[in-house]
UniProtKB/Swiss-Prot annotation:
Coiled coil: none
GO cellular component, one term: cytosol
Keywords in alphabetical order: Cytoplasm, Initiation factor, Protein biosynthesis, RNA-binding, rRNA-binding
Pfam families cross-referenced by the UniProt entry: eIF-1a
Family (UniProt): Belongs to the IF-1 family.
Function: One of the essential components for the initiation of protein synthesis. Stabilizes the binding of IF-2 and IF-3 on the 30S subunit to which N-formylmethionyl-tRNA(fMet) subsequently binds. Helps modulate mRNA selection, yielding the 30S pre-initiation complex (PIC). Upon addition of the 50S ribosomal subunit IF-1, IF-2 and IF-3 are released leaving the mature 70S translation initiation complex.
Domain S1-like positions: 1-72
The protein's assembly and partners: Component of the 30S ribosomal translation pre-initiation complex which assembles on the 30S ribosome in the order IF-2 and IF-3, IF-1 and N-formylmethionyl-tRNA(fMet); mRNA recruitment can occur at any time during PIC assembly.
Gene responsible for this protein: infA
Domain of life: Bacteria
Name of the molecule in the record: Translation initiation factor IF-1
Length: 74
């Protein structure tokens, strides 16, 4: 799948689930299940409830996503 086909959205972590999964509420109000991308897992980026994150979605399954970036709170 090409990078141009992925949908990128902003979301907020609602709940931390088992197995590295998260429940994320997107900016349009939809709640999806997401997992952490490989580079974030390797670099041990901690994600907590309330964090704002970037999520990539596949156009084929809009109920699951991949967390690609955690925004710093300023």
């Amino acid at each position: 799948m090409a990078d141009t086909e992925k949908l990128k959205m902003l979301g907020k972590i609602v709940e931390v689930l088992q197995g590295g999964n998260f429940r994320v509420q997107l900016e349009n109000g939809i709640t999806i299940m997401s997992h952490v991308s490989g580079k974030m897992r390797v670099n041990k980026i901690n994600i907590l409830p309330g964090d704002t994150v970037d999520v990539e979605l596949s156009p084929y399954d809009l109920t699951r996503g991949r967390i690609t970036y955690r925004h710093r709170d300023n």
